[in-house]
Amino acid sequence: MAVELRYDEEAVFLRRVNRFVVEVKSSRGVVRCHLMDTGRIDHLASPGRRGVLIAWLNRLGGKTVCRAQAFKTAGGVVAVVDSRVPNRLFAEAAPMVVGGDASIEAEREVFGSRLDFLISTGRGLWAVEVKGVNLSLDGVGLFPNAPSARAVKHLEVLARLAREGVKPLMAFVALRPDIRVFAPNYRVDRRFASLACTLLRRGLVGMVGIRVSIDLEPGVVRIRPVATAPVQCPPLQPGR
């Protein structure tokens, strides 16, 4: 089943005002739109280029009058920037990840830690944290696209849960269709990448990628999870 994002027009990106606001040139002039992705977007947009898919907000007042739903890159790839989408996609993809019938609970607290998902199957209990990925380099989806202390904390929580008999899993959900495999982003956040690869190599935290298809139609972006994909870490160097 597809996750749908509605949009009203394609605007010209002008600048990023702050973490949550971008300025665009639209049919209504220069306006400010809410941005739900607090990570970097310089790999998605450049000043003066058309390609911001915006939805008008039906409200009076406020600092923003629209929401940036997605960007079209210079290569024409649609990349979603709505931070609500990764969890919605994972909920659709969960059966292909854990296999068979699954009971899925969102925003569940386990052993004092709030998780994106708690999944119960006949093969055990899964604790899942979901990360959206919209940075792609030659088909490799890299996470994070900016240093993320929060993501490091989530890894530490998952590692602790493994000692409680829960199966910990970090799921990386593609937010653009050209991602084929996934990898921790050493160049941007060495702390996260090093911890992620250590936990993965030791079998302490499972990691999976989810590929998507994206269909752009007039007024709507449709995103579908299509397959799981590996999460790759660079080979260990001698002596490490």
UniProtKB/Swiss-Prot annotation:
* Family matches, as Pfam families: SfsA, SfsA_N
In the record, what terms sit under GO molecular function? DNA binding
Q: Where are the transmembrane segments?
A: none
InterPro entries attached to this UniProt entry = SfsA, SfsA_C, SfsA_N
The positions making up the signal sequence are none
Question: Which Gene3D superfamilies does the record match to this protein?
Answer: 2.40.50.580, 3.40.1350.60
**Family to which this protein belongs:** Belongs to the SfsA family.
What protein is this chain from?
Answer: Sugar fermentation stimulation protein homolog
Record organism: Aeropyrum pernix (strain ATCC 700893 / DSM 11879 / JCM 9820 / NBRC 100138 / K1)
